[in-house]
A protein has these predicted regions:
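Bacterial N-terminal signal peptides that target proteins for export
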Residues: 1-13
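Bacterial N-terminal signal peptides
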Residues: 11-23
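Active-site neighborhoods and metal-handling regions in enzymes and metal-associated proteins
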Residues: 24-490
Length: 490
């Protein structure tokens, strides 16, 4: 089933050896950021480009994260920055990065700022104070008469976001200037990753995979979901991950059927499964790996049946994934396997059967239990841009799932004449599988001839049960080599 997938072995050591073999590749250089800006300039052709960075949070105890399009173009991660580029004949004629000025009083509270004089060395872009942006913008925009914005610019929105407000302030007195949004063009550039980006994704995913291994040892009936979250996020930080890439999901029992459950405060019970959907961010690049585990270390027969359907669906998508294959093809293949499995266990009437919604629409019955897409791109964002057709350098997830929600009959399947046969037919299976939610998610890189699996945490039923049977006395000892990855990024 998974013959086309090249992986790095089942254990931690093979993965670690591959990562350490390329220590210099795990950073995106100023030269690469310049190539990205040049590629955008080719697409814009002529005029001004204004890339808008994220603003500083209103309180200094709220973490700041740079928005992904701006980080992609500049690598600059301080707040309030803006990049102004003048493009002529598809090339950058001039560019300036406007940043917060040095301010020793503010830096006493918030930390060191690079400042305009330090920007060139760090980013390769000439720097000026953001306080000078208005004057520079006024001089150039009058000449060009139009501007291309990179950022969430949406002047028609009811509530104006920070990007729109900052652009609107610059445009005061320039009503004749036309504005286009070229964030989509930046997203297209982000869809295929460079070698440096792929190395960062491998490392982020390796840390995430290690967190899953720790969780498999830590799980036990009576523990709370937040204890699992603590193990996960401790593992992330101790190996240099700056933060979780998204809110960690640890959903047990009925919570396993909630796709993006975030409360993480239920005491897990003997006989539960728990969905652990986690991802570290390393060097700005996000992993996203999910495992579904038996809390007591052994899957029940019913849990195994649902789990195997999901695993087979993932395997089918893996099997066909290679350059030239469309995302839609993989999605259809995975969905077909899920539908066939659900029909076999009695949760739907047949593979192609439908049900009637409250609005009178006919929807495939398998969507009662599998209501999301097969996967998504990964990169600077955990849901990163990716193309409709696979090509080498694309990084993405495959994550089918089945969720047997406890409110299926009361709130999900309308009690109307058209659905009576369905409701009667699937009730016995529902009672067997209720409160079982299963999602299996892995991360991949498309190669010239197939697929590289970069998240090899145990996922076969036997592998998981074997991993959970091993004694666990707490997190593994500090791995100095892994911590050294971070030093090489400085």
């Amino acid at each position: 089933m998974r013959g086309c997938v090249r992986n790095w072995g089942r254990g931690l050591l093979p993965l670690l050896l591959v990562l350490l073999a390329a220590p210099l590749g795990a950073q995106v250089t100023p030269e690469e950021h310049a190539e990205r800006r040049n590629a955008l300039a080719e697409r814009v052709g002529e005029g001004l480009v204004l890339a808008v960075g994220s603003v500083e949070p209103p309180q200094d105890y709220i973490p700041f994260f740079q928005n992904s399009p701006f980080r992609y173009l500049t690598g600059f991660v301080e707040p309030n920055a803006m990049l102004l580029m003048e493009v002529r004949d598809g090339a950058i004629a001039a560019e300036v990065l406007f940043v917060n000025p040095r301010d020793p009083a503010t830096e006493t509270w918030e930390g060191y700022r690079i400042g305009p004089d330090g920007v060139l060395e760090v980013t390769g872009i000439p720097g000026r104070s953001v306080e000078e942006l208005g004057e520079a913008f006024d001089a150039l925009v009058s000449e060009h008469g139009e501007i291309a914005v990179v950022g969430a610019y949406n002047p028609g929105a009811l509530i104006q976001n920070d990007v729109t407000q900052r652009v609107a302030a610059l445009l005061e007195g320039h009503s004749e200037v036309s504005v286009t949004n070229v964030t989509r063009e930046v997203a297209d550039l982000r869809a295929v990753k460079s070698d440096a980006e792929l190395e960062l994704l491998r490392r982020s995913t390796a840390i995430t995979t290690q967190a899953h291994r720790e969780v498999m040892g830590a799980l036990a009936p009576g523990k709370n979901e937040f204890e699992v979250q603590a193990v996960v996020e401790y593992t992330f930080r101790r190996y240099g991950s700056e933060r979780p890439a998204f809110a960690s999901i640890v959903g047990s029992g009925p919570n396993s059927t909630v796709l993006h459950y975030k409360t993480n405060d239920r005491f897990m019970e003997d006989g539960d499964v728990v969905v652990v959907d986690i991802g570290s961010s390393y060097g700005g690049y996000s992993a996203d790996v999910t495992r579904t585990l038996p809390v007591n270390g052994r899957f029940t027969e019913a849990q195994s049946e649902i789990y195997q359907i999901v695993l087979d669906a993932q395997g089918r998508a893996e099997e066909i994934a290679r350059p030239g294959v469309s995302v839609a093809q993989m999605d259809q293949m995975a969905a077909r396997v899920v539908a066939e499995g659900l029909a076999e266990v009695g949760l739907i009437e047949s593979v192609d059967a439908t049900y009637e919604t409250a609005e009178g629409q006919r929807i495939p019955q398998f969507r009662l239990f599998y209501m999301h897409a097969m996967g998504h791109g990964i990169g600077l964002d955990v849901h990163d841009p990716w193309p409709g057709v696979l090509e080498p350098g694309v990084a993405f997830t495959i994550e089918p799932g089945i969720y047997v929600r406890p409110n299926l009959f009361e709130e999900i399947i309308p009690d109307v004449p058209a659905n009576q046969g369905l409701r009667e037919a699937i009730r016995p299976a529902f009672e067997r599988y209720v409160n079982i939610g299963v999602r299996i998610e892995d991360d991949y890189i498309v190669t010239e001839d197939g697929l590289e699996w970069i998240s090899p945490a145990p996922r076969e039923i036997e592998e998981i049960e074997e991993a959970m049977a091993r004694p666990w006395d707490g997190p593994e000892e500090r791995n100095e080599d892994w911590v050294e990855w971070f030093r090489r990024m400085e």
